[in-house]
């Protein structure tokens, strides 16, 4: 395949890797199953096994984070008011788009460690960051309405947190997004593509807007 718009090119395997955010072995296995081809996977190298395991663990902890953000939203009247009153979201939209809330106190790290997840995994998923000042760990998302970012197959690859406060004396960034991880690379994922692709294909129209709430 060749895309004359962005100059991307390759074969069927590299196309699936790009389209579905898969590693090479995952793409080969996917195509074999799709085409009913008998496929005997070669033994993965230690590096490939480690990469696959790391990706699966990040997907897993992202799902845990989603459940935490969703439950936190249900417990936060300010977040609900912001989403439904100020932004005008319907409850159906909030559920379909997996919108949540990250509490101001930043308690996700504690929540995750109580469930047995290690700090290194939280760092790998960019759900926790390390302070450049003193090396301490802190939640990446705090006091923000959370938008879930999924890949083309529906896997949760990251999050985008939108500041809710109208006044911003600390000059905090309006958005904080998941940085580069083993499953999420900047520029490779479009928010709401997974939720919109089928409908857009049916009506042959897709509207592109600037911000997640739009």
What residues fall within each predicted segment?
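Non-catalytic accessory segments of DNA primases and related replication-initiation nucleases
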Residues: 1-124
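Phosphate-handling DNA/RNA-contact segment within nucleic-acid enzymes
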Residues: 47-65, 105-214
